[in-house]
């Protein structure tokens, strides 16, 4: 070895030795000590340093005193320390992202220096040795991927001599897979032979200061501007969870945080810091991939309590710091973490200790003896009902990972039931077993289900006096709710207010009152029916609750909460939370709608996707949400050019609330998977006379996944003739006979991407003028089992790439308004003409002979959004996707085990989707970037178009106020 090192000595050039040190941010003192030991071991193991050529001690001293520091503007918290000496170039990466580390590793391998050292020291998993980075992880698998890059191999092959690379990494796990590589002399974890020196100690002390964990207030920073975010529509934020997952599900009146991700700098913080309360926290599995982000939030809440009890400072500064949301019920099973960091603390034990300090008792999640009996998380008359079905674990296994299904049943008959699955690390076989126990539920047997579809049997069998009132068409009564919960909800004064309005006003006025909560005042349009509703006083979607009571020991709220209180920690299945006192001020009842309501279409077969920047109108209407990024504003004006004088944007301004600090979600921009695609042709889809039908420049890419996805927003129902707002002759045709009837299994029906005018029921094919001539505003549709399919989940986000989907039956672009006779492209050949007629006949049939069809074993279950089981929970084959049919699949968890089986999961999705009997549009949302996924996308892109599969990129952003954060918002 001495002869090899002496060869380049006469021609030794500056920086012939290259040192790359990678350190991850440490969250506890024990972890910091472990990382410093690994750093020292790595530097002292570099035997290639010839003391006659390079004095490592002097070079490290020079680094400490002369290095330059660079803070990344893209990856918050990442720092680069660099120094280039006469013989040694040193680069230290602190708290990097996975992409930054891969880029620097590529540069290290391609550098012509003959001797190189790579020290990988940071928090790592005990099982695999995978390093835990700010985003994702880094393992031996990722190292081999970078080493196998063609550009790297070409650089190594062109070198005059094979360079020597010493790698100091974890000595356990899968790092032993690193072996000899062509064109590279690789040495893995050699023993530490160099003596300790003063320069090395100074280097370690300086790095230790940079790796010390920040305070909770520095880790989770307060926003630049205060205010509360109101989420009126059902939605789900998909956050990049690093090695795990993190999601935030919200409905009108209740919010649920699911897991926290592996990054201590919580990915969900920039959203929840604008909330006054998180009503429920659901931890599907305890480990280093799901709890660090949640524990950071708990530490901040504890620090806020200590700061509030400490010396008083400036009032405004204290209010700005003490802003974390109040926490409701917490569901947590395991008492010990399933995965731990080497040298770190047990995240599950830490979470329970923090919850105990905050006075919160975590509740276990277990499947009951009757899995179809859910836990009612939230229920409010006139708003809806949120149910929690626990699919796993079974009774007697509390430490197993939990699998939860959330079902939101809104009160409005025409609104869509939302079904979201969070499996965590549940094995697929047990997940399917849990779903099989629920497949008899009507809400899981169709791709799209409305509340009207579920209330018919209850209304037929109900002996309550409410069955004879007109309000039963709008306020469904669930038979599974106990008498106590029903009477408790009934005691709310808001119900009497709504009933008085409904009983004293005529039919058309009643329609106006019911629809104002979705349309809102100030709708800018030229349609007479909307302007007729303009001067009317807005009626809210739901009465707000009084300030939410805190859990014992919880920090006091700074502002009044307008959300209903979280359920008591003693929730039991089929038990609703206690009622709350409604507010008396009608202004406080407004819920600040967050997105515009697209105007209804003129033809019953035309569907128009949500336009461009769906939440920007609410942003413009919010009194304290005017700091919009200039580039985003310019993009908005470019995508929506000025139209004719008679056309105006159907954009709804948000109603001003009594609170002076309401924050509205403004811009969402999920990027499409970035690959070369042919430019899409202009869609011949028709539209109404509003400015949504303005023709856009073909070179402008869509900025909303709602446009790129051929799905319909909940605000764009398929126009049909019947309506629950008619008080005249249509009431008889509208109401089914009062006999028990359960809908049969869903037959082949038109896909989620289109509406076949020939397949609609006869009443739905009536001209719009005939059906709605007596009404000033068209009521939301009440679709049948055949026409309900187009009401799909809308990913309300903006995409940066082109649509690129030629076979999609509905495009994001619209034709000019002077083409009212055009209808969207459909996939008629794939839809049997008899299926819609059968579905329509089934809906109109009545009598004792109507019985549900028997369910075959392994019948499919339809969901709106489903996370895929992660963390190496098990192999997902095509049978899984054949039985679990979701409109949106989320792949999360950038771990080594996840990447190893990723290609098989993606291929299984294609194979399973190919066997679906319904033509549904499916969206795949990955939370991380992967070379495996890129290759799969390039090789199978043509199949995506044929099967109706869209893949989003992992760089989605949500812009709120004056900053953006990585997330993808899915609206239902």
Swiss-Prot record:
Residues 454-469 have a biased composition (Polar residues). GO terms for biological process: apoptotic process; axonogenesis; brain development; dendrite development; metaphase chromosome alignment; microtubule anchoring at centrosome; microtubule bundle formation; microtubule cytoskeleton organization. Keywords: Apoptosis, Cytoplasm, Cytoskeleton, DNA-binding, Microtubule, Nucleus, Phosphoprotein. It is found in: Nucleus; Cytoplasm, Cytosol; Cytoplasm, Cytoskeleton; Cytoplasm, Cytoskeleton, Spindle. It holds the Pfam family MAPB1_N. It comes from the Eukaryota. Residues 1-715 are annotated as: Necessary for the microtubule-organizing center localization. One of its GO terms (molecular function) is identical protein binding. Residues 874-972 are annotated as: Necessary for association with actin. Residues 600-972 are annotated as: Necessary for interaction with RASSF1. SUPFAM superfamilies: Metallo-hydrolase/oxidoreductase. Residues 489-505 have a biased composition (Basic and acidic residues). Residues 602-620, 702-721, 781-800 have a biased composition (Low complexity). Residues 454-632, 671-854 are annotated as: Disordered. InterPro entries: MAP1 (IPR026074), MAP1B/S_N (IPR056617), RibonucZ/Hydroxyglut_hydro (IPR036866). Residues 537-550, 564-581, 737-748 have a biased composition (Pro residues). Residues 644-879 are annotated as: Necessary for association with microtubules. Its main location: nucleus. GO terms for cellular component: cell projection; centrosome; cytosol; dendrite; microtubule; microtubule associated complex; microtubule cytoskeleton; microtubule organizing center. The modification Phosphoserine is found at residues 462, 585, 590, 592, 659, 683, 723. Expressed in cortex cerebellum, dorsal root ganglia, frontal cortex, hippocampus, hypothalamus, mesencephalon, medulla oblongata, occipital cortex, pons, spinal cord, striatum of the brain, neurons, heart, testis and skeletal muscle (at protein level). Belongs to the MAP1A/MAP1B/MAP1S family. Microtubule-associated protein that mediates aggregation of mitochondria resulting in cell death and genomic destruction (MAGD). Plays a role in anchoring the microtubule organizing center to the centrosomes. Binds to DNA. Plays a role in apoptosis. Involved in the formation of microtubule bundles. The N-terminus of the heavy chain associates with the C-terminus of the light chain to form the heterodimer complex. Its C-terminal part of the heavy chain interacts with ESR1. This is Microtubule-associated protein 1S. The gene is Map1s.
